[in-house]
Amino acid sequence: MSAAQVSSSRRQSCYLCDLPRMPWAMIWDFSEPVCRGCVNYEGADRIEFVIETARQLKRAHGCFQDGRSPGPPPPVGVKTVALSAKEAAAAAAAAQQQQQQQQQQQQQLNHVDGSTKPAVLAAPSGLERYGLSAAAAAAAAAAAVEQRSRFEYPPPPVSLGSSSHAARLPNGLGGPNGFPKPAPEEGPPELNRQSPNSSSAATSVASRRGTHSGLVTGLPNPGGGGGPQLTVPPNLLPQTLLNGPASAAVLPPPHGLGGSRGPPTPAPPGAPGGPACLGGPPGVSATVSSAPSSTSSTVAEVGVGAAGKRPGSVSSTDQERELKEKQRNAEALAELSESLRNRAEEWANKPKMVRDTLLTLAGCTPYEVRFKKDHSLLGRVFAFDAVSKPGMDYELKLFIEYPTGSGNVYSSASGVAKQMYQDCMKDFGRGLSSGFKYLEYEKKHGSGDWRLLGDLLPEAVRFFKEGVPGADMLPQPYLDASCPMLPTALVSLSRAPSAPPGTGALPPAAPTGRGAASSLRKRKASPEPPDSAESALKLGEEQQRQQWMANQSEALKLTMSAGGFAAPGHSAGGPPPPPPPLGPHSNRTTPPESAPQNGPSPMAALMSVADTLGTAHSPKDGSSVHSTTASARRNSSSPVSPASVPGQRRLASRNGDLNLQVAPPPPSAHPGMDQVHPQNIPDSPMANSGPLCCTICHERLEDTHFVQCPSVPSHKFCFPCSRESIKAQGATGEVYCPSGEKCPLVGSNVPWAFMQGEIATILAGDVKVKKERDP
């Protein structure tokens, strides 16, 4: 045998495309052997349905026509039983009868079209593949209904052009290699090539997204006469025609077919476009008309009534975009929640440049920003934070709400600038390198003095290489009265179990996270408009929330004054009163960001109180906070470099390590304000009644250089005592807590011990430390 014959004998036939494939190109994981190309084209999750559809059509077609091969050869050892003469004659008679029926259907179809041509009669049309029996059509329709319930792929509005006769089924039946035989006069060669890449976009999308087996019959005659009804495959029809009866209303062209895109409006309950009507309920109408062309054409137009509203089923790209938007917003809210939860501890741990920059910027929030190319697109910056990856420098992170009042949170300037660009230009493909040169901020609300955000936050400031520019560049805080609820309040409200007595009640169900993003969104309507009753309920809750915010503004002022935000003027004789805490245990009734418009933000006031206390107690750096530093470091596994392991500190705080007993707050002149402060405040400058002292020698500790046991918060040691303990235990072996105890790590029985690098830092050259890599 020749090499070509050997190669052809090794090839297998794909069940779908019926092409000879090498064994390595075949996949045997499904009910039929299929090639990798078909699996990649249809998708592994839908290939079984396509195989089942092809199987039903092959059975109804009467085995394999047009010289199609019967598929892969039988396995070795299986004998093929030859048909008897009687069975062969019966099969031949059945095939001949079916061919006559198909010719009759083709003649009737050409008579209906009114544009019969010799070329069309000579070449078999692509529609002859649809000659199914009634039983097969019913079975295929049932399978299609089941498939729609499983996958529910809403197709985009489809226009069936003049090449509808040459459109191919997704299972690739109807001719050699699964494609129909084009006639010489059926159009340009681009339309007759019939490869998946060169087929029309409408047919390709319909065959990929709207794959349904079975036929849709009963459509009226395009000519309006009483001739036979058209038989159109369902993958070439919009999904709205498959789920409900058609009415006789003439509809405007859908979006993308010459019609202008109007503003989307919510639909009433049960109307097309509502969430319960996806897929096309009764009321969605379609018209089928004929267009004068060389071949027959069927144009289906989908709409909702005569008002020009959007159809109930939107394209899958819109749905994917909305899903990605919800996921992005949820991730941004999670980052915001994490930032707020650990802000009090982590900010105090950061270097002085980082801390000062964050304090300065936090004192300016919230302030408005807009898109440079379209001034109607407004958002607001409401929070800042500093993040760092291991081995990297700190980088500024800002949280922006866009549109204003929507609850949509973006954790980067480039993200919000990209969304603004898409809303402005309707271009979803372009990405922006840096959002700071596309955003402008208003220095003072109402002044019209808009400046580039990149001038306020240049790259040197964003990486904390330089300080914030002068005061003439800083914006003034402005809280819009029409939407006073900031996303930080939504995050804190989601964690607050109840409102303290005497301070007003929380609304019954404040939407948080994704719920807030969907119910407060103003940028564009969701592709699934909410039910009118739900929207009315959410609107009522929003009004109640805003009214509650307005009523509690005075309470916030009293809380700030009574809770220690005026602590710089507090007498040094008594312990300072605790401020409203930040974090997951906060029960405040009013979010901190809804403070008076011209006053400092509560976060900035809290940090200024900490700085003031650090100046009073520390002979060293006046701006550092020793107690906050120690409390933030007490859960760190490294007493020297605690900032490198923030994850363990957070884990310890979640495991309940922070539930310390704290003295009750001092009496307040305003009843009802005392319950605002929880009783489980972590170890902080407000909770410590005295200065930090060494556990062994009881001497005052330096605010930045001392050893903290990560297991026992009260174990704090100065460097001299730690050095003596390390020498006594032996620096070359395991060195445990300087207290003499083997303090177990959080959540385990393993005792905590110094690392070799920590020992070397504490000893500072007094004793040669054995390196971990030394033999």
UniProtKB/Swiss-Prot annotation:
Pfam families: IRF-2BP1_2, IRF-2BP1_2_M, zf-C3HC4_IRF-2BP1_2. Pathway: Protein modification; protein ubiquitination. Its EC number is 2.3.2.27. Residues 586-600 have a biased composition (Polar residues). Keywords: Coiled coil, Isopeptide bond, Metal-binding, Nucleus, Phosphoprotein, Transferase, Ubl conjugation, Zinc, Zinc-finger. The modification Phosphoserine is found at S69, S195, S498, S526, S618, S636, S637, S638, S641. The keyword Ubl conjugation applies. GO terms for biological process: negative regulation of transcription by RNA polymerase II; nervous system development; positive regulation of transcription by RNA polymerase II; protein ubiquitination. A zinc finger (RING-type) spans 694-741. It catalyses: S-ubiquitinyl-[E2 ubiquitin-conjugating enzyme]-L-cysteine + [acceptor protein]-L-lysine = [E2 ubiquitin-conjugating enzyme]-L-cysteine + N(6)-ubiquitinyl-[acceptor protein]-L-lysine. There is a cross-link at K79 (Glycyl lysine isopeptide (Lys-Gly) (interchain with G-Cter in SUMO2)). Residues 93-112, 154-322, 494-536, 563-684 are annotated as: Disordered. Residues 83-113, 314-350 form a coiled coil. One of its GO terms (cellular component) is nucleus. It is found in: Nucleus. GO terms for molecular function: ubiquitin protein ligase activity; zinc ion binding. It is an enzyme of class 2 (transferase). Interacts with CTNNB1. Probable E3 ubiquitin protein ligase involved in the proteasome-mediated ubiquitin-dependent degradation of target proteins. Through the degradation of CTNNB1, functions downstream of FOXF2 to negatively regulate the Wnt signaling pathway. Probably plays a role in the development of the central nervous system and in neuronal maintenance. Also acts as a transcriptional regulator of genes controlling female reproductive function. May play a role in gene transcription by transactivating GNRH1 promoter and repressing PENK promoter. This is Probable E3 ubiquitin-protein ligase IRF2BPL. The gene is Irf2bpl.
